[in-house]
Amino acid sequence: DGILFRVINFDGKEYYIDFVDLEMKLADPQTTMMILCNPHNPIGKIWDIESLERIGEMCAKYNFLVISDEIHCDLTAPNKNYIPFASVSKVNQMNSITCIAQLKLLLAGLQTDFIVVANPQLRHKVNRGINTDEVAEPNSFAITATFAAFTKGAVWLDELREYIEEIKI
């Protein structure tokens, strides 16, 4: 059991995090984990360094683990780069699990997703969890496809970003 909450608001111009509301919800002892979408899906909002740092500090204060869902990190507007949650501070790095999927490079069905965990104790727990059912074993085609996408897919990805920006409503 847990509590589902949203702390993102829209002021007519931009989406933002209500940090007062977030802190009230983090103070609830019934919950211990926060899922952060970065960039946010479906709005595409790339959270700035200050917001990510503040989220990290607040979650550490209340002993919250942050699962940072960064599966859309490649699909940003042209010339806009996302900021990985774990890259902002040591606190964020040691108190988070980052999930990245290669959906944008059309590798969704190949088991090429990544889980990044810097904290050794937390990484051990994650490894045990994903290896219990052997779901962490990519096939040989997935490895080759991922390598090709990362080494030869930049131009294609840039063109995809431009196309998405053109057709955006």
Question: Would you name each region that the model predicts?
Answer:
Residues A86-N92:
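Short, conserved catalytic or adaptor-binding loops enriched in Gly and charged residues
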Residues N95-I169:
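PLP-dependent aminotransferase class I/II
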